[in-house]
Curated annotation (Swiss-Prot):
GST N-terminal domain mapped to chain residues: 2-80
UniProt name for this protein: S-crystallin 3
Keyword vocabulary terms for this entry: Eye lens protein
Tissue specificity comment: Lens.
Similarity comment text for this entry: Belongs to the GST superfamily.
GO term, biological process aspect, one: glutathione metabolic process
InterPro entries reported in the protein's UniProt record: Glutathione-S-Trfase_C-like, Glutathione-S-Trfase_C_sf, Glutathione_S-Trfase_N, GST_C, GST_superfamily, S-crystallin, Thioredoxin-like_sf
GO MF term list: glutathione transferase activity; structural constituent of eye lens
Function: S-crystallins are structural components of squids and octopi eye lens. Contains relatively little GST activity (1/1000 of that of mammalian GST enzyme).
Domain of life of the source: Eukaryota
Length: 215
């Protein structure tokens, strides 16, 4: 088994899908949580000067959260059984990532840096919130219908197999649901899916024991 180190801030943010995949697979890894005060000094050492970044066997570096997530999903069996399945998992995951990305961008400063503070006002928060809300209106009904296409939406996006797509549904909506607990009231299948992820035999202990962070 390779050795893995995941580099990211002490927040869920864009790295949580990767942490959830490690948890779902039961694979050990070094969860390196970088303090914001460390980041300036190490930024230029990172590919694309960004995190998250996955390091494999202290030799290979993979930047970009969704590239990391897809790699882990393939390695651990959470990316579908064939190319068509994988394409389905990918488009569902990307749809939820659009929601996550638009949400987090409401808390970016003018230079594009994530502030990790709910109280932060970047001066364009109203415009960015409107964009986030429009993204949700565009994507959530489609995701509800997509889920219903397999077994009436009563299992997972790929039927009886939990994949990265289900984990993305959970983590992308965590913060938005904190802001608006009724967000999924019109999408009962998605709400039930999140509950299934939360009660999964490996996800439940992880979600209960992980660090509590604002984002």
């Amino acid at each position: 088994m390779p050795s893995y180190t995941l580099h990211y801030f002490n927040h869920r943010g864009r790295a949580e899908i990767c942490r959830m995949l490690f948890a779902a697979a039961g694979v050990q890894y070094n969860d390196r949580r970088v303090d914001c005060s460390e980041w300036t000094g190490m930024r230029n050492q990172m590919p694309c000067s960004m995190m998250p970044m996955l390091e494999i066997d202290n030799r290979h570096q993979i930047p970009q959260s969704m590239a990391i997530a897809r790699y882990l999903a393939r390695e651990f069996g959470f990316h579908g059984r064939n190319n068509l399945d994988m394409a389905r998992v990918d488009f569902i995951s990307d749809c939820f990532y659009d929601i996550l990305d638009d949400y987090l961008r409401m808390y970016h400063d003018k230079d594009g840096r994530m502030m990790f503070q709910r109280s932060y006002d970047n001066g364009s928060s109203s415009e960015r919130r409107m964009r986030f809300q429009e993204t949700c209106r565009r994507i959530l009904p489609f995701m509800e219908r997509t889920l219903e296409m397999r077994n009436g939406g009563n299992q997972f996006f790929m039927g009886d197999q939990m994949t990265m797509a289900d984990l993305m549904c959970y983590c992308a909506l965590e913060n938005p649901l904190t802001d608006d607990t009724s967000m999924l009231s019109s999408y009962p299948k998605l709400q039930a899916l999140r509950n299934r992820v939360m009660s999964h035999m490996r996800m439940s202990p992880y979600l209960k024991s992980r660090s509590s962070t604002e984002f």
